[in-house]
């Protein structure tokens, strides 16, 4: 961790054929109060900047120098060599390992207190897997690299935070994955980070049921009766965490609940993320809770068709960086 008031945020550019490099280069158009270090191939960034017509000076990253506020028209690059020349819009499996190297470098830097937070650009899971590496997402990757047994995936936009009990698993596996043990661990992490990272003294956590109508008293499924409700009651009794639910997912996003909710906990990926993205797509941020470092990310994919065109929406990426900075500053 940097010791002065100016912090060092590492940014990974993600899939080189996608809009990640475009988003990173867009950061150079304005001043930033903290130092932004881009983990990517320097030549790839220069080529994309030329394609986009962005006038930017790239400086080599020196970890021995004290961090300085970022000036418009500049980027500091921690160079990671790409395997093959990246062509905007054209995936290349040869560069799958390159993407992972940038993520590994960023994670190692955070764990060594060299960086204060990671902001990740979008990656293409298919390319990485076809390169011979089993990869299900940033969240799981950073958990493995930091030896964190369990992390929580949260997405946030203005007026709404959602977190997940299960993440990137097939829907058919969700019911068996929603266990008392997992629920308790997920809620512990969610509550802890809401208190410590978001500075919410006594957070209200609203919890979705798994089944339609939260099981309708067992008529539409018994997971609520047998697992979810007893676990929530146990946690409230033993730990005093404020939990409301399980509530039907089709009504939990009503304003009368959201006005009081500091976070909504969903049982699976597509139960809560469609609502979040409908409410704030392009203005949302992905936050990994439970890691020993701060990590935020965009809420969208690689958008290959927009790479190099100058048409990519920078809203989510800028939100992710701004949110990371806010969380870092709260730690000061």
From Swiss-Prot:
Source species of the chain: Vibrio parahaemolyticus serotype O3:K6 (strain RIMD 2210633)
Family annotation (InterPro entries): PdxA, PdxA_fam
Chief localisation class: cytoplasm
Assigned keywords, A-Z: Cobalt, Cytoplasm, Magnesium, Metal-binding, NAD, NADP, Oxidoreductase, Pyridoxine biosynthesis, Zinc
Reaction(s) this enzyme catalyzes, per UniProt: 4-(phosphooxy)-L-threonine + NAD(+) = 3-amino-2-oxopropyl phosphate + CO2 + NADH
Top-level enzyme category: oxidoreductase
GO terms (BP aspect): pyridoxal phosphate biosynthetic process; pyridoxine biosynthetic process
EC number: 1.1.1.262
A Gene Ontology molecular function term of the record: 4-hydroxythreonine-4-phosphate dehydrogenase activity
UniProt remark on cofactor binding: Binds 1 divalent metal cation per subunit. Can use ions such as Zn(2+), Mg(2+) or Co(2+).
Localization per record: Cytoplasm
Tree of life domain: Bacteria
Residues reported in the UniProt entry to bind substrate: 138-139, 277, 286, 295
Protein name: 4-hydroxythreonine-4-phosphate dehydrogenase
Quaternary structure and interacting proteins, as annotated: Homodimer.
Keyword Chaperone: no
Pathway stated in the Swiss-Prot or TrEMBL entry: Cofactor biosynthesis; pyridoxine 5'-phosphate biosynthesis; pyridoxine 5'-phosphate from D-erythrose 4-phosphate: step 4/5
